[in-house]
Amino acid sequence: MSPGQDATLLERSIKIAFVVALYWVVSISMVFLNKYLLSEVSLDAPMFVTWFQCVVAVVTCFILGELRSYHPALEMFPRFAFDTHVAMKVLPLSLVFVGMIAFNNLALKFVGVAFYNVGRSLTTIFNVLLSFFMLQQRTSMPALLMCGVIVAGFFVGVNKEQEQADLTMAGIMYGVLASLCVALNAIYIKKVMPFVDNDMWKLTAYNNMNAIFLFLPVITFMGEIPDIAASEDVYSGNYWFLMTVAGLLGIAIGLVSMLQINVTSPLTHNISGTSKACAQTILALQLNDESRTATWWLGNVFVLGGSLGYVLVKRAEMKRDLEKVPSSADSKA
């Protein structure tokens, strides 16, 4: 290998390491900051916190769209001009999106960060079930076996978390509902993308704009308005700073996820996400000075290992299907 190739390889390795580290920092920071806002501040208004993050997302998308002509890196962000017709087309997805982020934050409020990944681990299972019932797509036996490993890890984790920590049934149910909504969200995104010119950032803007209006009756129904009006936190600049940072991290995670996929691959992105979840669990236990039994850790290993195994199985199946296409074309010729 020539010196020039060595230098190029080193530069690429440094770039990959930087992007992966950035993804970890943004993702873990977002989880811990949301946990703080939902559990540690005196204002108990999880739907209001989620609503404000949607406001930050829309404002950020609008600003980035207006700045797109000032730098080539910003050209990926479209100018956001609200169209009622498009918003109505996106509305079914927005309803699922509201459920997803609402249940996600409620799950984070009622469970510890260390258990958060286990509590949200059934997304893959719901993906398989919804793909079968809504899209008539069957799942192979190896993939189903990996799903079985995930389910086993979930129940082991729930059982041991109940023994060692203050885990409520509400926390478990919110985690399950969040997983269901994440799976539904993935299906509806595919249906809605043509209405936004297959532009993910335009979809983000419309989705969050719809969510701003959809969350208002939810906030009222949950009785959060009197709590907001009576809270001293809303008069604290530090509170609004942290709320804004949390909203910006929500946008940033989409950016760094795409960046990580671009400089590596979708498979590496999934492996990085699994590794990050493990590091996040260890960090949460260290920061809270907590310990868990070997069986609790076994549940986590099942969840993370099953999730990674599912990704590897699906990748192998996709590769095999792609290899069949040229061979079938050759046989017809």
From Swiss-Prot:
InterPro entries associated with the record: Sugar_P_trans_dom, TPT_transporter
Catalysed reactions, semicolon-separated: GMP(out) + GDP-beta-L-fucose(in) = GMP(in) + GDP-beta-L-fucose(out)
Keywords of the record: Golgi apparatus, Membrane, Sugar transport, Transmembrane, Transmembrane helix, Transport
Residues passing through the membrane, by range: 13-33, 45-65, 95-115, 139-159, 169-189, 211-231, 239-259, 293-313
Source superkingdom: Eukaryota
Gene Ontology molecular functions: antiporter activity; GDP-fucose transmembrane transporter activity
A Pfam cross-reference name: TPT
One GO BP annotation of this record: GDP-fucose import into Golgi lumen
Compartments where found: Golgi apparatus membrane
Topology in the lipid bilayer: Multi-pass membrane protein
CC per GO annotation: Golgi apparatus; Golgi membrane
Role: Antiporter specific for GDP-l-fucose and depending on the concomitant reverse transport of GMP. Involved in GDP-fucose import from the cytoplasm into the Golgi lumen.
Family: Belongs to the TPT transporter family. SLC35C subfamily.
Identification of the protein by name: GDP-fucose transporter 1
Biological classification of the source: Eukaryota, Choanoflagellata, Craspedida, Salpingoecidae, Monosiga
